[in-house]
């Protein structure tokens, strides 16, 4: 287990999670921000990428497990993403549709932000969200993030407008404020 919250725990994805992951990544409505559901090969590539991220970075998108049932209901975690001319640490989340609107994404995303600031000593974290994904934008806002940019992301042959959300570590902000007053 990587992170535990009141109702959830987050752990590394494993090959045995492929069926649960497919419920998320092969659902058309869940994946509309990605221009449609993934096929079996894309799901396997997604899983392999996360396992590679754990080995390379020590983190990635983690399986979100509902404590009450021990069921994998989504994924949430931290990944490096390219934005403009820099690489940023992103909090990402995707949940099975039947678990939407229960606060699980917000609960997991807040825990990932705390993990980034306290365990990884990150100075800031971002969320990159499709302009049409109002629910994910609300999760970012509830996670203390502020929209700070807009850009076009090219994916699956489509130009997709996205918003960039950002949160700054309080510790980093205090250090910056202190240095300004000296």
Model-derived features: where do they sit?
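Conserved GNAT acetyl-CoA-binding A-motif
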Residues: 120-128
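Conserved acetyl-CoA-binding loop-helix of GNAT-fold acetyltransferases
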Residues: 101-115, 138-142
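A short, well-structured alpha-helix characteristic of acyl/acetyltransferase catalytic modules
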Residues: 1-48
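Conserved beta-strand-loop-alpha-helix junction that forms the acyl-donor binding cleft
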Residues: 127-137
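A short, internal acetyl-CoA/4′-phosphopantetheine-binding micro-motif in the GNAT/acyltransferase core
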Residues: 65-67, 92-101, 130
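Acetyl-CoA-dependent GNAT
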Residues: 15, 36-37, 41-90, 168-170
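Conserved catalytic-core motifs of GNAT/GCN5-like acyltransferases
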Residues: 128, 146-162
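Conserved small/polar residues in nucleotide/adenosyl-binding loops
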Residues: 171-178
């Amino acid at each position: 287990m990587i992170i535990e919250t009141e109702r959830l725990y987050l752990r590394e994805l494993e090959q045995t999670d492929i069926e649960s992951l497919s419920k998320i990544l092969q659902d058309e409505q869940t994946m509309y921000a990605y221009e449609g559901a993934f096929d079996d090969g894309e799901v396997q590539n997604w899983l392999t990428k996360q396992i590679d991220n754990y080995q390379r970075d020590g983190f990635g998108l983690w399986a979100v497990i509902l404590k009450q049932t021990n069921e994998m209901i989504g994924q949430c975690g931290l990944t490096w993403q390219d934005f403009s001319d820099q690489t940023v640490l992103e909090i990402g989340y995707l949940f099975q549709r039947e678990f939407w609107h229960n606060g699980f994404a917000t609960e997991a995303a807040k825990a990932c932000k705390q993990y980034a600031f306290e365990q990884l000593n990150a100075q800031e974290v971002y969320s990159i969200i499709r302009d049409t994904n109002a629910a994910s934008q609300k999760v970012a806002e509830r996670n203390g993030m502020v929209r700070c940019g807009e850009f076009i992301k090219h994916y699956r042959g489509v130009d997709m407008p996205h918003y960039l959300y950002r949160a700054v570590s309080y510790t980093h902000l205090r250090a910056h404020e202190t240095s300004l007053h000296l």
